[in-house]
């Protein structure tokens, strides 16, 4: 599977899961929903989550391969972020896209672990 195509899917899947999480937390103000969604789904947050997963050594070889497929693809980063952060975030999205196809529960479990990491101060955005 193409890494950038997986990242495309993973980006949408991750954002949907973040939005569902925020709604279930009782946030009703649209401005607050948007602010929290941006904080949890930013490239910087995704890169932090990915680094956290790697530090825990909880990913299988197949999952690491899916991450690398997205991370190693040639693409242009946005001006306001560095290339390493962009590559890590794209790799994270590729991993989530891959898992959303082959093991949706694992994708959700990792997303929930990432949310917990961010909420406990792993990334303050």
Curated annotation (Swiss-Prot):
Cofactor: Mg(2+)
Keyword annotations: Cytoplasm, Endonuclease, Hydrolase, Magnesium, Nuclease, Ribosome biogenesis, RNA-binding, rRNA processing, rRNA-binding
Main location: cytoplasm
Family matches, as InterPro entries: Mini3_fam, RNase_III_dom, RNase_III_sf
Record SUPFAM superfamilies: RNase III domain-like (SSF69065)
The protein's Enzyme Commission number: 3.1.26.-
Described purpose of this protein according to its UniProt entry: Involved in correct processing of both the 5' and 3' ends of 23S rRNA precursor. Processes 30S rRNA precursor transcript even in absence of ribonuclease 3 (Rnc); Rnc processes 30S rRNA into smaller rRNA precursors.
The protein, known as: Mini-ribonuclease 3
Gene: mrnC
């Amino acid at each position: 599977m193409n890494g950038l195509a997986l990242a495309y899917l993973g980006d949408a899947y991750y954002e949907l899961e973040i939005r569902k999480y925020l709604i279930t937390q009782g946030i009703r103000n649209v401005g607050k929903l948007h602010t929290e969604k941006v904080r949890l789904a930013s490239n910087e947050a995704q890169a932090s989550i990915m680094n956290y997963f790697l530090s825990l050594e909880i990913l299988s070889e197949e999952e690491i391969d899916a991450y690398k497929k997205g991370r190693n693809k040639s693409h242009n980063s946005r001006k306001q972020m560095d290339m390493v952060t962009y590559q890590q975030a794209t790799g994270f999205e590729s991993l989530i896209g891959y898992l959303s196809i082959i093991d949706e529960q694992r994708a959700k479990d990792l997303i929930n672990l990432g949310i917990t990491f961010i909420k406990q101060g792993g990334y303050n955005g």
